[in-house]
Amino acid sequence: MPVFYTPIPQNLRVGLANVSGSVFINNRTRDSADFKDHYLENEACAEVSSHLPLQMMLYFNMFFFPFWWISELLMLQLKFSYLPVYYQCLLVTGMVLISIFEVLRMYLGYAGNLKEKVPELAGFWLISFLFQLPILLFFITDPDIIILPLERAVHSLYLAFLLGELMASFLALRVMTRKLAQQFHMRQFGHVQGLHTAEALPMFGLPYGGRSVLPVQDI
């Protein structure tokens, strides 16, 4: 299993984890009867929560992006002289930003999904929604940038990848945050149950002094 070293600072990871917990967990008060089947609870906590459809889309997106980048670069070179100066600056800036964010996005997506790390996967979702999606929508919807047929085709396919990854990562985050919350509740419940058991043992067995309170008869 590869080891992923996250570039996210620790304070930002904590913030992303808190935001993910507040957004993706259904904060309902749980009754104590919810924990009556401990075997099923432990089995659910041990279940792998990595999202296979998300991993497949990340895999194919990683191979598709170089083709998208080369196509966009060639189309930009063809139409560059026909564009106003401000559109030239916008398109070049958009290409640079989308390339940088794509590398970071793929890394966070792989690390978050394979290693089941909520902050990394939340960072992947936020970058996809706040940066990649607006830039790509600008590339595909503004008619003044002279959208060529090849551009429209590769942008549409890239947009399909992006929307699918957004939905899949949202579902994966819900599963991971619920699993973490379930593990937390199980640890708390197990700790309280252990304390109650330890307090009850001296009443029926050996007290703290090591002497039995029950009468012992010679055989």
Swiss-Prot record:
Location(s), subcellular: Cell projection, Cilium membrane
Gene Ontology biological process: cilium assembly; non-motile cilium assembly; smoothened signaling pathway
Record keyword Glycoprotein present: yes
GO cellular component assignments: ciliary membrane; ciliary transition zone; MKS complex
A matching Pfam family: Transmemb_17
The keyword Transmembrane helix is annotated on this UniProt entry: yes
Glycosylation sites: N18, N27
InterPro entries from the UniProt entry: Uncharacterised_TM-17 (IPR019184)
Entry keyword set: Cell membrane, Cell projection, Cilium, Cilium biogenesis/degradation, Glycoprotein, Membrane, Transmembrane, Transmembrane helix
The protein's assembly and partners: Part of the tectonic-like complex (also named B9 complex).
Function, as annotated: Transmembrane component of the tectonic-like complex, a complex localized at the transition zone of primary cilia and acting as a barrier that prevents diffusion of transmembrane proteins between the cilia and plasma membranes. Required for ciliogenesis and sonic hedgehog/SHH signaling.
Family: Belongs to the TMEM17 family.
Stated name of the protein: Transmembrane protein 17A
